[in-house]
Curated annotation (Swiss-Prot):
SMART domains: C1Q. InterPro entries: C1q_dom, Collagen, Collagen/C1q_domain, Tumour_necrosis_fac-like_dom. Multimers (predominantly trimers). Interacts with ADIPOQ via the C1q domain to form a heterotrimeric complex. Interacts with CTRP9B. Forms heterotrimers and heterooligomeric complexes with CTRP9B. This is Complement C1q and tumor necrosis factor-related protein 9A. Probable adipokine. Activates AMPK, AKT, and p44/42 MAPK signaling pathways. Glycans are attached at K73, K127. Residues 24-188 are annotated as: Disordered. Keywords: Collagen, Glycoprotein, Hormone, Hydroxylation, Repeat, Secreted, Signal. It comes from Homo sapiens. Residues 24-82, 95-154, 155-191 form the Collagen-like domain. Residues 26-40 have a biased composition (Low complexity). The keyword Signal applies.
Amino acid sequence: MRIWWLLLAIEICTGNINSQDTCRQGHPGIPGNPGHNGLPGRDGRDGAKGDKGDAGEPGRPGSPGKDGTSGEKGERGADGKVEAKGIKGDQGSRGSPGKHGPKGLAGPMGEKGLRGETGPQGQKGNKGDVGPTGPEGPRGNIGPLGPTGLPGPMGPIGKPGPKGEAGPTGPQGEPGVRGIRGWKGDRGEKGKIGETLVLPKSAFTVGLTVLSKFPSSDMPIKFDKILYNEFNHYDTAAGKFTCHIAGVYYFTYHITVFSRNVQVSLVKNGVKILHTKDAYMSSEDQASGGIVLQLKLGDEVWLQVTGGERFNGLFADEDDDTTFTGFLLFSSP
């Protein structure tokens, strides 16, 4: 139908061209309605193969695949053959003893042997019978003087003898009764000024610092903060007090407990005398101890942590102190 409309339009145009010499051109007509869509053309031929494109960016990793199904259980293998153990045989019977062989021929006579050792002495024989009494012998010599006999009875009292010499002076007799108190005597002259009595002295107080807190275990605690040690009886390098004046001493210690538990002992010459233990409970705590000791010259006293590093919570800073004190109460001869 569209083809017919197309041919008609061409024909009209051709007629108009031929009549231009004789007719005037008229006004253009009103455009007709759009024609219907034409039939689809045939498929074009395949084009030439294009160049290979650039490689695309790697894709994202795929999600893990699902687990495969379990395989079927294999058949049970045949049981292996076990060789049967043989039966133990019976014990054989004991054989009969053999017959005695014939007696051997006598050997030649040996040489004469050496003389044997003397045999042991025989036992004592029985006592023989008493023989007949012999004739009387001659008179013997006079024997020695016999021992002195016992004293005889006391004789009668004799006449008084002459007067003897005077004997030595006897011991002093007991003091007599105290006499009546006498009159007060005159005042004596003033005596000379005596020597001033010098009392022996020994004392110290030491403490820990930030550098010496949390001391090591099982060794003397070295207190390096000197509060009083005028006589140098406490050795800061060794951490020990040494007795220079024999007598009775008082020792005391005051501990600030922080961060860890505390377990200390006061030691005298290597022997633990006094023990103190305190458990840390999340805030600062205090522990202390004191004792009176009799010391001799050269005795040593110190404090030490016992039980390991878990019990060395002895603390010190600008606001907290841990101290060790000792002083002489009185000397002894």
